[in-house]
Amino acid sequence: MRTITHIVLHCTAGGAQQKTSDIISYWKNKLGWNKYGYHWLISEDGSAEHLTPDSEVCNGVKGYNANAIHICYKGGWDGTDTRTDEQKKKMLELVTNYKTRFPQAKIVGHRDLSPDLNH
């Protein structure tokens, strides 16, 4: 298993009802990525898709991916926290699980690690 130093929280910066297939298509076709952007993607009903195995690196935050777990919720279009209660519950469940497994890991938001503190 990789050494996990960060648990990074994200929003898709899109509508809460985005289709996962559209998000994946954006990564592949627009950004040219051959890996997914997150380990977990949480829909507005609180269901979560495990997109990338924990043992694998994904494209969450440049420079931090080798040692991070990335958890994202669908939403956050206007830069505000648009999580539903169900998304908050699932995110807390996932973060709690990972923090138990990797107690040394820092919990941060994507913007805390990006150079301009905005992307």
Question: What function would you assign to each model-found segment?
Answer:
Residues 22-24, 63-66:
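Surface-exposed beta-strand edges and their flanking turn/coil or helix-capping segments
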Residues 1-12, 44-48, 53-54, 64-67, ...:
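Basic/polar, cationic surfaces and motifs that engage anionic cell-wall
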Residues 57-61:
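Flexible, surface-exposed loop/gating regions in the mature catalytic domains
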